[in-house]
Amino acid sequence: MAAEIHSRPQSSRPVLLSKIEGHQDAVTAALLIPKEDGVITASEDRTIRVWLKRDSGQYWPSIYHTMASPCSAMAYHHDSRRIFVGQDNGAVMEFHVSEDFNKMNFIKTYPAHQNRVSAIIFSLAAEWVISTGHDKCVSWMCTRSGNMLGRHFFSSWASCLQYDLDTQHAFVGDYSGQITLLKLEQNTCSVITTLKGHEGSIACLWWDPIQRLLFSGASDNSVIMWDIGGRKGRTLLLQGHHDRVQSLCYLQLTRQLVSCSADGGIAVWNMDVSREEAPQWLESDSCQKCEQPFFWNIKQMWDTKTLGLRQHHCRKCGQAVCGKCSSKRSSYPVMGFEFQVRVCDSCYDSIKDEDRTSLATFHEGKHNISHMSMDIARGLMVTCGTDRVVKIWDMTPVVGCSLATGFSPH
């Protein structure tokens, strides 16, 4: 069922502790059980499984429950030991797990959506279960009565969700690349604002209520940090992945962001440094360096008897430039560009060698990652994906210490 991996610890990379196999289809969610050597998984194979580590070091299923429909999302509340499972048919089901994690009792079904559930969050304080789905809506339901309290529709599939417990604000990412901030009330809601910055569908969100920062990952392979608390519209772009960003986790104590992408890439971003906002791209009818016309500028092409050029943009200054004036490439990590991007010649000359020092570390998960979650207190991470494999990682060599105690393993 599960193999215990004895990797030689290396100070610079995540250590693979265990690999769990046995699912018959893609694993859509995997969550570590706090203070236990256990993992809860939900899969397209219609099963919910609770895996506990045995004396042999291997993980074996102590609970194996088959659902009526493929499982598409999951939330777990440890203090009350409640599991909420979203399904492909739109229903959300609630279960209660026994104290020894050997038995799971069905509580109720919530008719939350008309189509696949994409994300679930449970608020114990409000007694709400909030969910998003491919029926283009966010719904919130009362866990006491099981009744629908409200729903709000979007123009495209709602793909991910975060919720601020104190203010009852929900953040919903969708397939159009937009993030909507909603204030949820008992039977209604109001749209506060929409955030636009990604060029692809939003795949994941992470909300840090302490610094009031929202992080989003998308199919444009990028992460954006939205400084909600600063109230100045400040955003930071982070580009280092080569595939769709699928999962995020912000470590507030160490100011590090962990992100995972579909190709198995694991990135750890240092957010405890002074970063710069990437500039808005400027528009011009001619190169802002050599003044040669771009190909749609027919009048200047005719007047100067020159061929029109393609428009490009310098990632550092945002100016519209031709290919000749932006022939060089450079990384610029302080602006979030961890790999080489197009810069104009004058910006290239202004970038010093120390400016190219990476502000992130990149690692290989060696499987397709569709979902990741962390037990931040223990520095553990679990990843899962379409290869049906669940991997448990020790992230303390990468993030520096055991986050709860400040104890360094080295």
From Swiss-Prot:
List of residues that carry Phosphoserine: 408
Binding site for Zn(2+) 2: 314, 317, 344, 347
Keyword Transport among UniProt keywords: no
WD repeat spans: 22-61, 66-105, 112-150, 153-192, 197-236, 240-279, 364-403
SMART domains: FYVE, WD40
Entry-linked InterPro entries: G-protein_beta_WD-40_rep, WD40/YVTN_repeat-like_dom_sf, WD40_repeat_CS, WD40_repeat_dom_sf, WD40_rpt, WDFY1/WDFY2, WDFY1_FYVE, Znf_FYVE
Gene3D superfamilies: YVTN repeat-like/Quinoprotein amine dehydrogenase, Zinc/RING finger domain, C3HC4 (zinc finger)
Subcellular location: Early endosome
Binding locations of Zn(2+) 1: 287, 290, 322, 325
An example Gene Ontology CC term for this record: cell junction
Disulfide-bond pairs as recorded: none
A GO term, aspect molecular function: zinc ion binding
Zinc finger (FYVE-type) boundaries: 281-352
Keyword entries, A-Z: Endosome, Metal-binding, Phosphoprotein, Repeat, WD repeat, Zinc, Zinc-finger
A single BP term in Gene Ontology: positive regulation of toll-like receptor 4 signaling pathway
Transmembrane feature ranges: none
Domain-level remarks: The FYVE-type zinc finger domain mediates interactions with phosphatidylinositol 3-phosphate in membranes of early endosomes and penetrates bilayers. The FYVE domain insertion into PtdIns(3)P-enriched membranes is substantially increased in acidic conditions. The FYVE domain is required for its function in regulating TLR3 signaling.
Function: Positively regulates TLR3- and TLR4-mediated signaling pathways by bridging the interaction between TLR3 or TLR4 and TICAM1. Promotes TLR3/4 ligand-induced activation of transcription factors IRF3 and NF-kappa-B, as well as the production of IFN-beta and inflammatory cytokines.
Subunit-level organization: Binds PtdIns3P in vitro with high specificity over other phosphoinositides. Interacts (via WD repeat 2) with tyrosine-phosphorylated TLR3 (via TIR domain) in response to poly(I:C). Interacts with TLR4 in response to LPS. Interacts with TICAM1 in response to poly(I:C).
Protein name as catalogued: WD repeat and FYVE domain-containing protein 1
Species annotation: Mus musculus
